[in-house]
């Protein structure tokens, strides 16, 4: 029996809570575009991060191993996954997938990707991550490339915009609390 390879796109919205996304039942319309993607694809209903912060949690997601097995226990490039533990992109590449990533961070998750479009942090930059619009633009270019090259592909798209510091652009800056955000009675955050 021949196994069909489906294309896989894994979106990671760093620090976004599923219970605040409308596709997961939140009563406010907070994620209309993601809702449309979710209607056409697969959604995980019970998915929990095994560790914080980002690097250990995502390494577990990419290896299927706990932090005590892969040894990424902190938020630094000083930590590398244990040699010999395959990353998801490596496994899929061995199975015939081409692998692409549009990441908001540096090269934390680059192992196993044929094309990894990361972002090098700079102390001169006012924010140390790539804006979502840029990640989306990079991802769409990679998607065009993947389709043109043909065959099955895996793409990892990693957004950081919802991460601290919380500076949403207008009009979203007042979507949940329209009064003085310094008011001690403000319990919206």
Where do the PLM segments sit?
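Catalytic domains that recognize anionic headgroups
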Residues: 1-189
